[in-house]
């Protein structure tokens, strides 16, 4: 125990709270570059995982499996497998509502926007769409486990990026956005995973 305690003391000594600046400043140009980088990273990540999605369920992908990245790969997937980017088009739907209706847009406006969109959805997203359009169950009940067998799926986790990108250095704001929108389609672990991702983005600035 003494060794463990001394080890923890050493670790916390090297990474104390004094290492975290009380204030971070950056130019608008740097901020914009970081936000663009976040969107680019999400798009690249969707594409990179495309060839292996659902092929290695329950096991790790072996190091011997090549992950190819030919030229124009993103363009190819966007044109031939657009469903792969549900992470992106769900995010953009929510951002569009913020852009048109403001930061205090009512939660029903987000719910109806994606529920009536023509793009394909799966699992938690699809269950929420069904609840909203066909059962008249609006958020937050649309994502509650009593109404959705997919409430704890990863749908919100893979779509929460926008909440962090819109809240640079403001994890509390990212959590508030997540509380409103995440419960449209998720509950419990399905929601907590999204809040975690949104906060990582917010703190990355």
Question: Where are these predicted regions, by residue range?
Answer:
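Sec-dependent N-terminal signal peptides
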Residues: 1-5
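C-terminal motif of bacterial Sec signal peptides marking the signal peptidase cleavage site
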Residues: 7-10
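Structured, active/binding-site neighborhoods that engage oxygen-rich ligands
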Residues: 13-205
């Amino acid at each position: 125990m003494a060794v463990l305690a001394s080890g923890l003391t050493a670790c916390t000594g090297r990474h104390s709270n004094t290492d975290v600046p009380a204030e971070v400043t950056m130019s608008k140009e740097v901020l914009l570059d970081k936000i663009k980088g976040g969107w680019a990273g999400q798009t690249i990540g969707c594409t990179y995982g495309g060839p292996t999605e659902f092929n290695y369920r329950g096991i790790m992908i072996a190091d011997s499996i090549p992950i190819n990245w030919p030229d124009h790969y993103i363009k190819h997937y966007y044109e031939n497998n657009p469903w792969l980017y549900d992470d992106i088009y769900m995010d953009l739907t929510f951002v569009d509502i913020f852009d048109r209706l403001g930061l205090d847009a009512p939660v029903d406006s987000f719910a109806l926007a994606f529920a009536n969109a023509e793009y394909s959805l799966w699992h938690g997203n699809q269950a929420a769409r069904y609840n909203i359009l066909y059962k008249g169950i609006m958020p937050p009940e649309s994502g509650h486990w009593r109404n959705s067998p997919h409430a704890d799926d990863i749908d919100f986790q893979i779509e929460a990026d926008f909440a962090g990108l819109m809240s640079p250095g403001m994890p509390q704001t990212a959590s508030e956005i997540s509380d409103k929108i995440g419960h449209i389609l998720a509950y419990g672990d399905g929601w907590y995973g999204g809040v975690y991702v949104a906060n990582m983005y917010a703190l990355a600035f």
